[in-house]
């Protein structure tokens, strides 16, 4: 993540284009807040006529019209309070939605390496918690700044109107208060960043337990996970207490500064020259206004913590939005590729690794042929598939499809030529039919979806489901067995009918009987298309046109099944290990 420290103003300037489309709501809210603050000031100003005329003169009419004014002011405060709260909430909701949409859209365009380096819990926290913090903290801060700022201005005007000499004393404390706020602001920003990171750790810890709850139960890891969660939760609590401490310390400092000013005002009011200009009503209004200033001053100090929290969250989100998305500089588009694939001197190293996963790999797969990759775990087989789909880009060398470097094609066009069935099947919380026709629900007919399911030998169990193809399968197909989930994925690939097929341990989750049944469908699927088959079970690739043996990122053997057995090398050794020969 980019932790470049942006000033509050710079961060706010970046946020403003997102907020500005809803500025009418902000303007209405600001006007309502000013009216709300004006109501408080006007209520306070009624003290002078009440004391000097209402109680001072027996025949005064002040006491007769004063109740009507009070009722009118209270109605104004109530209505303005409602309007301001509604408008701010409306703007806040819109900003949260826009931030989440922008973040979600940007993340979808990020390279696979980005997700490899970030925990799912942390990213979820960014989309949910941080986005909410930007709007809620900033909107709360805006309400306080406008309302309390208007209150301070109104109270100063009131004080200067009745006694400018006494009011000048308060001007002295303004620079001191601003200095305190500035010092505390830096502390708030630092703590807010730590709180966001802590929230990401809390989310990641909870997500890890929820996703791996079976492993936690079977291995007795409850204490380990509880301790881990308690640790990150306590760290977040500590950051929260630091925020409270910084805020709590700044409050009494400002109040102490203000109290000295008030004490000096009382002392100055006893000077004969000043006393001659004051009445009981005037001194009461001036002194009451000074006491009333304490509340907005305290609120403005506290709002700084809220605003800094929002700006820190905003900065974190912008650091993600500033990250470069997948490079998609290609211009070529394919309707349907022939399927000629060539790897030429390809070397690749994962961003977080020191040693390359593939070194100087070269191979050619003619259109319509089946090439199998075999080797021990971690040898680099799946990396080859990842490079062919441009989930990663090569560090050295080139990969060609129909004679053109993969980087010359638009990403969407390139990936549209490839159907992928991996050992890690991901299904969506949707119906069986929509999972088979994922992202193309309106492109295929019901009959085509059902035919693909039949070819994948999936209709046998689909018919037994409560609603057949319209059955909801839960998050990641939790209501299906591993083999059933894999058959749905194979049906998805069959329906897509792409010219290039990648089978990455496609039958690994199937039992022997299901594997035999589906192998016929896979054999039919592989006809007239280029197939790259990554296999652990060697029995599934005996009929491949060519078998490549990958070891430590190198192709160490190549040939068909029989020739590799006769060579008595790595492939022959793997074969003997599997079949007990």
UniProtKB/Swiss-Prot annotation:
Binding site for ATP: 375-382
Keywords from the named record: ATP-binding, Cell inner membrane, Cell membrane, Lipid transport, Membrane, Nucleotide-binding, Translocase, Transmembrane, Transmembrane helix, Transport
SMART domains hit by this protein: AAA (SM00382)
EC annotation from Swiss-Prot or TrEMBL: 7.5.2.6
Catalytic activity, reaction form: ATP + H2O + lipid A-core oligosaccharideSide 1 = ADP + phosphate + lipid A-core oligosaccharideSide 2
Gene3D superfamilies tied to this protein: ABC transporter type 1, transmembrane domain (1.20.1560.10), P-loop containing nucleotide triphosphate hydrolases (3.40.50.300)
Topology term for the membrane: Multi-pass membrane protein
Keyword Transmembrane helix: yes
The record's note on its domains: In MsbA the ATP-binding domain (NBD) and the transmembrane domain (TMD) are fused.
The name this protein goes by in its record: ATP-dependent lipid A-core flippase
The encoding gene: msbA
